[in-house]
Regions:
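Extracytoplasmic gating/loop element in the C-terminal half of outer-membrane beta-barrel translocons
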Residues: 330-334, 733, 788-878, 883
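Short, glycine/acidic-rich beta->alpha junctions
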Residues: 108, 127-130, 139-143, 229-231, ...
Length: 918
């Protein structure tokens, strides 16, 4: 346990117990107990926000972001390539709202997805209009995802207990060539490289026959490291109830995830098995202290540990590149296999013999809202104080050990009808025998947030006014230098409606970021929104629109605006034996244009309800001009004599349409529902600081954000004569079998001036989801699908499409799908020749490697049955069977289109669970 954890526990729990004791005898009903922590400012002139309540009840996800796939128009869940955590086996997921990373709020406090478990969530809202964004000033420009946790009710105690077991299997696991196939093809590649063969005929036969398993092994490294399934265990408990003056909700969630890796049992002095343990505890308390005073206290504690072997990098970085013939798992004498060429990369030894790494994380998140009704002074007036404090500590523990490995340097020669082998065993490394243990704090993190508000709400006949004035400050401090982030805001909002038919909101935010110099720190972010309910019956029609400004400091860093000086050349004072003094010189040029990104946003939409609102339709269009984007400009002349730092000069535009349709109906004991939603996103680069280009097609301006560029492949060189008669090639030596490119500018040279835009963007044009649910009496079924289209991915991101390069392996997956060029295969080759070299000519961005990355996935499907309480006497029970990520329709087929690189494999999981309601 961390040294300060006991103290923090006392600081948080003691006031909570005192409050509970003080109010236990109160019987007065407070009019303030309906405060919605997820909607404290109560803007009215917008559409019905995208809202979802039931998804976390039906979706047994280890990562709650999985449950959000396809549930909200415009919200994309994707692999977080920029959120890799080396302490975890799996890549985290990230949210993208209209191409940006939205601000995530939990009960009105800025937090992360890692801070909450699905069992705690009451509702999720996606706020996309300009007025909602302006409320959060310099943090609101990327949109807002607001999560509200469950709260207690004036009711007897209700208890739920749930257990689920998840059976995980790899989704499209790769297959790699066996030793003989590898040996045969590496000989072919070396021949095409103009190099001698690596294996003679007798050695190839040895690889095929397994006659000499230590000198010429055939190892399926994937099967040596992975088992055929992983196991997940999840247990959840909730407690809800209370009186009119004291209400509570508590939850306990435990998850143990045993990964696909095989058990590591080589040394009983440490545990090198891969597992992830998480324990989450939440307590939400609502207290009516007096008739005019209300308090909400939320406390979340999360303990997590991730354990793995003490290898230096992801084990997949070895599995995807190590040939099956490289070396055996172990030699005959028991030493681990390895070579002087590959070093100590034996993945089995790395997992079992290097020791253990255990990462522990403790989170304590606490926030409190105190609301005082001031109606005795001014009718409709109230005041809020909202305080949050988060403490996150990360501890690393290590057991370290080294291992010895060896190789057999062998030659097989033919002797008549038989063969003989000559071997020399070479040893490397040392077996440390002893295990050293150490531990250290990886990081300490503190977040503090303070919000104070004055609220005024009055009715004047048919007129209703709701106004707020607030001050907000946030502080995030991470151990290390220049790792803090601080903001301050003063904001106000006024909402008006007439007979709940016509609505108007005005928001003004004056917000500043500590990343900026003091004289340029604060900026104004105003917004206005209007709405009208045109039809308030059947049918129902509401139209709304908004326009305003908001900001984002997410890409800023400390000291970018400051001119720094770094060590320069030295100068000697004195004669022989004089003293050298280091000089100083200008570092990167200061970001003189530094300012937070500015979002100028406008939205317009409709909410439509038909057939007694069984059919609900929402359509919303938006336009955003995004300015002051931080980029590295290349259009600043080098005559200034220093390197150029990032500057806030970029500009992009984002336009799109979000559409959602839902139908829900009931006939007696049968109910059902259908839904579909989609978000279209059109982007354009307006300014990116690109230097002057000789040809218009080289400019990125006017193209979509994330547009793919590359050389246009027009064929494969068939012979040296064709190479000689072609334009000059500048990407390394070119041989028959290499890719042939179009000379776009006709200058007789193939170089970077011939890159053109091709295919589409890395950002999807359309993100969509659809699904259904049905129930008959105690039976329920559901299915959720999600997909994207209009997105381009590159096979260069997959190690399976880099066969044999730089002494790596070749995958059977690649061989089953493609035909490489070689003499005799020219007519039907789909890929360039095999090579053991780097081949910078072939393996660069070009039209051969880009592929359509569209897909449709079955994200969730499930069936459940509830056994009523009258049958069990004590409680009712629900048994369920659920599948996640079961299949994908796409053009890639050999891998998960969302994850082509060398990483822990995607998994499909089948869950079986039982839930008791007491």
């Amino acid at each position: 346990m961390y040294p300060n954890m006991k103290r923090i526990f006392v600081y948080i729990t003691l006031p909570l117990l005192l409050v509970c004791t003080a109010v236990s005898a109160q019987e007065t009903v407070s009019p303030l107990d309906s405060v919605d922590l997820g909607n404290l400012f109560r803007l009215q002139a917008n559409g019905n926000p995208d809202k979802c309540r039931a998804i976390f009840e039906k979706s047994p996800e280890v990562d709650i972001a999985n449950a959000l796939y396809g549930q909200f128009s415009g919200l994309l869940v994707e692999n977080g390539y920029d959120t890799y955590d080396s302490n975890q086996a799996k890549r985290k997921l990230a949210l993208r709202l209209h191409g940006h990373t939205p601000l995530l709020l939990v009960d009105g406090i800025s937090r992360s997805l890692d801070d909450i478990d699905g069992i705690e969530i009451d509702k999720v809202e996606v706020l996309k209009d300009a007025a909602a964004s302006a409320l959060y000033g310099v943090k609101g420009g990327d949109g807002v995802v607001s999560i509200t946790t469950k709260r207690g009710k004036d009711s007897p105690l209700k208890v739920t207990a749930k257990y689920q077991y998840g059976f995980a299997t790899p989704f499209r696991a790769p297959e790699f060539a066996d030793a003989y196939t590898y040996g045969f093809l590496v000989n072919e590649a070396r021949m095409l490289d103009g190099l001698p063969a690596k294996y003679n005929e007798a050695e190839l036969f040895a690889l095929y026959s397994g006659q000499y398993p230590y000198a010429y092994p055939n190892v399926n490294w994937w099967d040596e490291v992975y088992r055929d399934h992983g196991d997940n265990h999840q247990a959840e408990f909730t407690f809800m109830g209370g009186s009119r003056n004291f209400r509570y909700f508590a939850a306990v969630d435990y998850l143990k995830e045993d990964f696909l890796y095989k058990k590591a049992t080589a040394d009983d002095r440490y545990n090198a098995n891969h597992y992830d343990n998480r324990l989450g505890i939440r307590a939400n308390v609502d207290v009516n202290i007096t008739e005019s005073t209300m308090m909400k206290i939320n406390v979340k504690a999360r303990l997590a540990e991730f354990n793995r072997g003490n290898y230096s990098d992801r084990i997949e970085n070895t599995l995807y590149y190590l040939p099956s013939a490289a070396f055996p798992v172990k030699q005959a004498d028991g030493t681990y296999g390895g070579t002087s060429q590959y070093g100590a990369v034996n993945p089995v030894a790395q997992m079992q013999e290097r020791g253990q790494k255990l990462y522990s994380q403790t989170k304590v998140l606490a926030d409190m809202l105190l609301r005082q009704d001031l109606g005795v002074f001014v009718e409709g007036l109230s005041a809020d104080v909202n305080v949050a404090f988060d403490y996150i500590g990360r501890l690393s523990e290590e057991a370290k050990k080294e291992f010895r490995y060896s190789e057999l340097v062998s030659t097989v020669a033919a002797q008549g009808d038989s063969s003989y082998i000559l071997s020399d065993q070479l040893y490397y490394g040392t077996d440390s025998k002893t295990v050293s243990f150490s531990h250290w704090f990886s990081s300490l993190e503190m977040k503090m947030e303070l919000q104070t508000r004055l609220n005024w709400e009055r009715n004047f006949g048919a007129h209703h006014v709701d106004a707020h004035a607030a001050y907000r400050q946030r502080s995030w401090i991470l151990s290390g230098q220049n790792n803090s982030s601080k903001t301050q805001e003063i904001l106000g909002s006024v909402s008006y409606n007439w007979k709940k038919r016509f609505f108007a909101d005005v928001v003004v935010n004056y917000s500043g970021s500590a990343y900026m110099p003091k004289d340029k720190r604060f900026h104004w972010y105003p917004a206005v929104s209007l709405a009208a309910i045109v039809l308030d019956g059947d049918p129902y029609l509401k139209v709304y629109g908004s326009a305003g400004l908001s900001g984002s400091d997410g890409d800023l860093r400390h000291e970018l605006w400051r001119q720094n000086y770094v060590s320069g050349n030295s100068y000697y004072f004195g004669g022989n034996g004089g003293t050298s003094y280091s000089g100083r010189t200008e570092g990167d040029m200061a970001a003189v244009t530094l300012t937070p990104e500015l979002s100028r946003r406008a939205t317009f939409g409709i909410d439509l309800g038909l057939f007694r609102k069984r059919l609900a339709i929402n359509a919303e269009g938006f336009m955003e001009d995004r300015r002051n984007i931080l980029i590295y400009p290349s259009n600043i002349s080098e005559v200034i004599g220093v390197d150029v730092n990032e500057q806030s000069i970029g500009e992009n535009t984002y336009k799109g349409i979000d559409l959602s349709v839902a139908w829900n109906d009931r006939h007696g004991d049968f109910d059902y529902g259908l839904y579909a939603n989609g978000g279209w996103l059109f982007t354009k680069v307006i300014e990116d600081g690109q230097a002057y280009q000789m040809y218009d097609y080289l400019y990125r301006k006017g193209n979509p954000v994330g547009q793919c560029y590359g050389l246009e492949v027009i064929g494969i060189f068939q012979n040296q004569m064709e190479i000689n008669n072609s334009p000059q090639q500048t990407f390394g030596a070119v041989l028959p079998g290499d890719l042939k490119y179009r000379d776009q500018n006709g200058d007789g040279i193939i170089d970077s001036q011939d890159r053109v835009k091709m295919f589409g963007s890395y950002k999807p044009l359309l993100n969509f989801g659809f699904g259904l649910h049905a129930g008959y009496k105690n039976f329920k079924v559901y299915a959720d699908f999600q997909g994207v289209t209009g997105v381009t991915i590159s096979l260069l991101g997959s190690p399976l499409y880099s066969p044999l390069r730089s002494s790596t392996t070749i995958s059977q997956t690649f061989l089953d799908r493609e035909v490489t060029w070689a003499p005799g295969r020219e007519a039907y080759a789909t890929m360039p020749r095999l090579t053991t070299q780097e081949s910078s000519n072939n393996y660069r961005d070009n039209s051969l490697w880009y592929r359509d990355g569209s897909f449709i996935k079955l994200r969730n499907v499930g069936i459940s049955y509830t056994i009523p309480k009258k049958a069990l006497k004590l409680c009712d029970a629900t048994v369920s069977l659920t599948g996640t990520n079961l299949f994908s329709l796409d053009n890639i087929r050999f891998a998960d289109p969302e994850q082509l690189d060398a990483y822990y494999p995607s998994t499909r999981v089948v869950w079986a669970g039982v839930k008791f309601n007491f």
